[in-house]
Regions:
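FIC/Doc superfamily catalytic core
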Residues: 1-255
Length: 255
């Protein structure tokens, strides 16, 4: 009789035992490559995999690109190490410190491990002012801490609101996407990785949600990415809830 394998215990076990070629290895490389690539990192998938598996650099690459890739691996591990802890300001700031540690910049606005000093924008979206960021993040965390049954609607809503706050000078998208991983794993949901190929669809979905235009595109993107993860879980023979849900059904639940 086969033993049921669940994703979170497998990730924790493979991390602890430094297992090569498993789902932990794949998720680390896929997540770091795509999340960094969306933000302009120029490392190839093979370079990303090489850094993770050998802790060395193959060929020539930007120092900052390498640091951000290695740092993302540490952030992924931090999500696993703190899986029993709720999302908090402290955890969010520590993720940012790990992500941006060692990055070379002469930008006066660069603050590592703490909130932005100056206002910023995301396209045409006006983000939260620096002096209001801490209160906005606390309010967002507090609101979601009272939700008993978290589903993909909640994950998308939290992500869109976090990105609208845009609490840091840089790294907001990567931190936000790492938090979706934490929310999914903590709530027994299949996590997802937004691929670089989905970037424009993903950004359009964020923008539509943030201006209150419509809410389907972002969740559709998350659900599509979740299907890709389910295929990987099938390959590695990891069990998961096979209940199918559509973006429209999630919206109807809120009505």
């Amino acid at each position: 009789m086969s033993v049921s394998r669940q994703l979170l215990p497998v990730l924790l076990s493979e991390k602890k035992n430094a297992v090569k070629g498993g789902i932990y290895n794949k998720m680390q490389v896929d997540f770091a490559y795509n999340s960094n690539r969306i933000e302009g990192n120029c490392l190839t998938y093979e370079q990303t995999r090489y850094i993770f598996e050998t802790h060395t650099i193959g060929g020539t690459a930007s120092v900052n690109d390498v640091f951000e890739t290695a740092n993302h691996f540490r952030c992924f591990d931090y999500i696993l190490d703190t899986i029993d802890e709720p999302i908090s300001e402290k955890l969010i700031k520590e993720l940012h410190r790990k992500l941006k540690s060692g990055i070379i910049t002469d930008d006066d606005s660069a603050v590592v491990g703490d909130y932005k000093k100056y206002p910023n924008t995301v396209g045409e979206i006006t983000t939260t002012l620096p002096e209001e960021v801490s209160g906005a993040v606390r309010a967002l965390i507090e609101e979601f801490s009272h939700r008993n049954a978290v589903d993909m609607y909640d994950v998308a809503e939290f992500h869109a609101e976090f990105e609208k706050i845009h609490p840091f000078y840089d790294g907001n998208g990567r931190i936000g996407r790492l938090l979706t991983l934490k929310m999914c794993l903590q709530n027994g949901m299949v996590p997802f990785i937004i691929s670089d190929l989905m970037k424009h669809f993903y950004y359009a979905g964020l923008n539509e949600w943030q201006i209150g235009q419509k809410y389907t595109r972002l969740k559709d993107g998350f659900l599509d990415a979740q299907d890709d993860m389910k295929a990987a879980l099938d390959y590695f023979r990891i069990d998961y809830d096979r209940t199918e849900v559509t973006a429209r059904e999630l919206i109807n639940k809120r009505k």
